[in-house]
Amino acid sequence: MAILEQPYLDLLQKIMSEGHGKDDRTGTGTRSYFGAQMRFDLSQGFPLLTTKKVPFGLIKSELLWFLRGDTNIRFLLEHNNHIWDEWAFKNWVNSSEYQGPDMTDFGLRSQSDPEFNKIYQAEMKKFDQRILDDEDFAKKYGNLGDVYGAQWRHWEKREGGFIDQIADVIKQIKETPDSRRMIVTAWNPEDVPTSALPPCHVMFQFYVVDGKISVQLYQRSGDMFLGVPFNIASYSLLLNLIARETGLQVGEFIHTLGDAHIYRNHLKQVEELLSRKPYDSPQLWLNPEKKNIADFEMKDIKVVDYQHHGTIKAPVAV
């Protein structure tokens, strides 16, 4: 057995000791380090953090949402996944149709004002339920624009039509595995202004050698405490799914980050996490009867032997 999260723990420690203080668009402030890389050997296990509980069900449903080409949070809510709620909710409360309580700067205010947080949580609950119950409302306010699902599966071409980058890269892996063009990108400068959140994981590239497939992700911005553990598990899962469809063994997940940062209101949580001793990493189970990415459902993907420490809560910077 192996402790696969060690590169993540090492990077957290590096940012804590060597990071630079920076302001950011959320107004929270960060401790930031530019140009970091972590490597995870997926043949040794699955790099789901053990130093805190990471809800794997959310990672599964989010990745399947991306792979469906979906950009509406309704699918996520149907699977009790609230990762993207705040960005859709922001579009709703900033619209002319919203007539509820003032939600200006709801992210920061909900952290500092307990009374406002109660109002915010009630409004968010009503919003989520309306997305589930009202199809027209969901189409208008549940859609996040040109986020990952759109860019991966429906990249719009200038001359009309679209490119399915996932299908194309799988075809390349099968037919020309030595290619240096096996890339999927989510960064389209034209779409950045219309996205709820411009892509943080900008592009990823596959590499095949000796019957093994690896992937390298370039992430422009990484919330090290909340977001990056999800990204590590999500791209490791994606690589396993691609390996299954292409008949290859899994190699490495290489995670390259631009601005790797710890929010100032996460510093205590990071200290607590770093004080914990990691357990052996779990193993990933994929339904052996499924071969194609499109056929996988939630029940076909599991982690086994997942021993972990308790949850550490931290606020999301929106």
UniProtKB/Swiss-Prot annotation:
Residues the entry annotates as binding dUMP: 25, 180-181, 220-223, 231, 261-263
Subcellular compartments: Cytoplasm
Binding site for (6R)-5,10-methylene-5,6,7,8-tetrahydrofolate: 223, 317
Any one GO CC term of the record: cytosol
Transferase in keyword set: yes
Residues of the active site: 200 (nucleophile)
Protein function: Catalyzes the reductive methylation of 2'-deoxyuridine-5'-monophosphate (dUMP) to 2'-deoxythymidine-5'-monophosphate (dTMP) while utilizing 5,10-methylenetetrahydrofolate (mTHF) as the methyl donor and reductant in the reaction, yielding dihydrofolate (DHF) as a by-product. This enzymatic reaction provides an intracellular de novo source of dTMP, an essential precursor for DNA biosynthesis.
Family under the similarity heading: Belongs to the thymidylate synthase family. Bacterial-type ThyA subfamily.
UniProt-listed HAMAP family: Thymidy_synth_bact
Protein name: Thymidylate synthase
Organism: Lactobacillus helveticus (strain DPC 4571)
Taxonomic lineage: Bacteria, Bacillati, Bacillota, Bacilli, Lactobacillales
Gene responsible for this protein: thyA
